[in-house]
Design a protein with these regions (language model features):
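A short, conserved alpha-helix in the catalytic core of glycosyltransferases
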Residues: 1-7, 56-83, 88-118
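Residues at helix-coil transition
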Residues: 11, 84, 104, 139-142
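Residues at the C-termini of beta-strands that transition into short coil/loop
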Residues: 21, 102, 113, 121, ...
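C-terminal, non-catalytic tails of nucleotide-sugar-dependent glycosyltransferases
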Residues: 26-27, 38-64, 68, 73, ...
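Conserved donor NDP-sugar-binding/catalytic core segment of glycosyltransferases
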Residues: 1-40, 108
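Short glycine/serine/threonine-biased micro-segments
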Residues: 14-17, 31, 44, 67-68, ...
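Flexible loop/turn segments at secondary-structure boundaries
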Residues: 25-29, 92, 118-120, 124
Length: 154
């Protein structure tokens, strides 16, 4: 099942987080991991799960810059090592910030299409990013946001 699939990647000690393919209510992709080219967003948002993606990227587990906090399996000691989620991002970008903290410490983040879950995005909160959050994430991680080492295609 999906939980065992994600747990399998956590057997590698340098993996800090694993995320599944998240689907919208209508079955299209909500997130295939994060991409930060040219700004933080969900990779392949709105695309069909039947697509291969460039170079077959939607059909293989891969390292990525980050995964969506809606469903992110996290290694406990890595979470505490990096200071966990930041209170500076109460609505948006908290998963982006956490992912970058993991990467800065040398951990890997894995996205897998072999675990799939529905994500009813914004069903419990508004889909907003405050100007302060946008400015803070850009100031804190601009060097990484504008140079996504895992995603140079889309």
């Amino acid at each position: 099942d999906w939980l065992e699939v994600m747990l399998g990647y956590m057997q590698e000690p340098d993996v800090a987080a694993v995320g599944p393919m998240l689907l919208l209510e209508d079955g299209r992709i909500q997130s295939a991991g994060h991409s930060h080219t040219p700004y933080p967003h969900n990779f392949y948002n709105g695309r069909s799960i039947n697509e291969l993606g460039e170079l077959g990227i939607l059909k293989v587990a891969r390292e990525c810059t980050g995964v969506t906090g809606a469903c992110m399996m996290v290694r406990r000691n890595a979470y505490f090592e990096v200071g966990g989620l930041s209170k500076s991002f109460p609505l948006s970008f908290n998963d982006v910030d956490l992912s970058f903290k993991f990467l800065d410490r040398g951990y890997r983040i894995i996205w897998t299409p072999f675990a799939r879950l529905f994500h009813f995005e914004t069903a419990t909160r508004p889909n907003v990013s405050t100007p302060q959050e946008v400015e803070l994430i850009t100031n804190r991680w601009g060097n990484r946001i504008y140079n996504d080492e895992y995603c140079r295609i889309e």
